[in-house]
């Protein structure tokens, strides 16, 4: 299965951690970890919040290929 999101890569590029993102979104760090490993996916509203927090477009987080 191909990775749907590139969240882990985007976090690294922005020098941010799973813990930082979890705190900003008010979610459990385990949830962010699951997003980063593509075990589960964030919903569209959460993707929009993540893109604003990291100052990137949603298309930079999602792998459309």
Feature locations, PLM:
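Conserved hydrophobic/aromatic packing and binding residues within compact polymer-binding modules
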Residues: 7, 21-22, 32-35, 61
